Every structure is written in C-alpha cells, then in structure tokens.
Amino acid sequence: SRKEVKVLIKKGQIKVNEEVIKSDKFQVKEFDDQITYLDEPLVYQKDFYYVLNKPAGVISATQDNYEQTVMDLLSDEDYREDLFPVGRLDKDTEGLLILTNDGKLAHRLLSPKKHVEKEYFAKVKGVMTEEDIDSFARGLVIDKGEQTLPAQLFIDSIDHEEETSAIRLILHEGKFHQVKRMVQAVGKEVTYLKRLRMGGFLLP
C-alpha cells in the first residue's frame, strides 16, 4: 500500500537506479527506472487478474449503496479502483467471476463473435432427459421467441424420488438469465446455479 511504501522509503530500503530514495514524492518512470527493495528488483505490473469464487447474495458491480458487491470481497491490499468484473453473475448465482483492469481480455471473453465457452453446474427441479440433451444440442427457442446457440447438456445425476436433477451445461454465448431460461424452456426450474469455467479460466 502507499502507506507501507512511505515507511520503507523512510527506512532507506527503496532504491531507484541504485540510489537510496529519501522522499515519497520522488517521481519514477516505471519502464525506464530500476527500482529495488532491499536490493531485490521490483517489476512494474500494469494489469491485474483475480479469479473470484462469488458467493450467493453478492452483486456483480463495482459499487452499490445498498448491496454488497464483488469489490467488497477484496482485501485492502488487493483493492484497486480500476478493477471491474468481466461480465456478471446474478445475485443468487455462485462461482467463477474474473476481476481485472485489462479491457482487452474482457473484450475477448465477452465478445459474441468469440463464442467463449462458459460451463455451469445447476440443480434442477424436475427430471432432465435425453430429449432435453438433444434439444439443448440443437439450440432452444426461449421466452420472447429468442433463439439460443447449441449448448452441451450433461446430466450428472437424477433423484427420481425427489424429481430433481444435477446437471452441467456448456454455453457459447451469454444471454440474460440464459441457463435459467433454457431449463425453463424444457419445463424444469433451476434451484441452484454455479459457474465453473469461463474460457480457460477455472474455479480453483
């Protein structure tokens, strides 16, 4: 933090181009100057990336006057004002959310032209079937006549007594409430939803 750096400078532990820095007002050229702490070089980091396992009840926003946001989950040490979530998860949805200040990465992950895979785990009220797998593979017409791209549905388990299912779903787009709406289109209801993967980013 800035406060900690000031303390280190006062202790004479920071050097720029092998000269001990005496003032925290010293101007540094991040790409030209060599900065060391206890004679160990420090490397300037421009872009930051955090893979967050978002809990339910937290909103995918940078700030809100009433709700807890994903930015509130960061420690003071990790918090940066230029961070933002890549896309969003519903308030009641858990799982993978990337926080970054890298706009190019965000564009690559969110661009509809890229068809980046997003994998979800869901608990469903209702028994999913082989017919549902085929329907998802063809693409579904969800409410308001909106057509989805083909999606891969995997049925992990079925409880016939409780009439519930556990599924995984791989999407190649990101429509509003898409998983819930696709499951609803085949007559079932999502009761729990967690994102496991976005492109090459996986939950730890």
Tell me the role of every PLM-derived stretch.
Residues R2-P204:
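Basic, flexible Lys/Arg- and Gly-enriched helix-loop patches that mediate nucleic-acid binding at interfaces
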